[in-house]
Amino acid sequence: MSDDSLGQFAKSFPVSWEELHRTAKALAWRLADHLPFNGIIAITRGGLVPAAIVARELELRVIDTISVVSYGAADERDMVQKERGQVRVLKPTQVDGDGAGWLIVDDLVDTGETARAVRALLPQAHFASVYAKPAGRSVVDTFVTEVSQDTWIY
């Protein structure tokens, strides 16, 4: 990634598959103290891989998803256009109630907008992410690595 393509981000933080796997396992180890969970709700798409790793490590078999759009861009498949800061649930979770006993997993909490939207739907769920930026850190219950707000993670 060139400096020009970073845009608003002063730093870049490339994450290999191996590093993501190691860090997601570390997330699972931190979550072990919070067991039992009824299951996992992965925030698509970024939370899918970490959720699978966490589920395997914690021996959780029930995995649901919630699909949330929170970044500006047009998606040709469903023609969603949004401005940054708006959040839209494309596919809700099948979990009933307030989320008590459930674990929500995402790869990154950035501004916290997605996390706040999901938290509003499932206020009693335990929210975990692999990476957290300062603006969204307070929304998650458990995370592994904090990165600065001006860092692009890819």
Predicted features by range, described:
Residues 1-154:
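PRPP-associated nucleotide enzymes
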